[in-house]
Amino acid sequence: MPYFTIDTNIPQNSISSAFLKKASNVVAKALGKPESYVSIHVNGGQAMVFGGSEDPCAVCVLKSIGCVGPKVNNSHAEKLYKLLADELKIPKNRCYIEFVDIEASSMAFNGSTFG
C-alpha cells in the first residue's frame, strides 16, 4: 500500500501521466512491493516557499506498511530525489521527504484492513 504524496509549486498542468506512472514504478521497485498497491498523489500549483524562495520545491510523504525505516530510508531517499530532480527539475536541496511506517491494521483497501 505504498502511498507517495508530493506537494509542489510546480504547476499541476506540468505533471504528466508519464511522470505518475514512472513514480509508481520507482516506488514499487524501491520498496519491493507490487505496483498494483502503489498510489501516487501530486498536488501541483501549491503556494509554497522553501528556504525563503519560491523557486521549484516540494514536500513529500512516503507511507508504507513496512519497508521504511532507519536501515532503508537513505536508499529510498536517493531514488526519490533522483526522480524529482530528473522529472520535475526539483533540486535535492529544495525538497523534504518524510517516511512513515503504517501499521497494517491502520490501513484499509478493498473493504478491509491489511492486518
From Swiss-Prot:
- What GO molecular function annotation could you give as one example from this UniProt entry? phenylpyruvate tautomerase activity
The principal location of this protein is secreted
Q: Which domain of life is it from?
A: Eukaryota
Subcellular location(s): the record lists: Secreted
Q: Where is the active site?
A: 2
Its biological function?
Tautomerization of the methyl ester of L-dopachrome. Inhibits migration of human peripheral blood mononuclear cells.
Q: Identify this protein by name.
A: Macrophage migration inhibitory factor homolog
Native species: Brugia malayi (Filarial nematode worm)
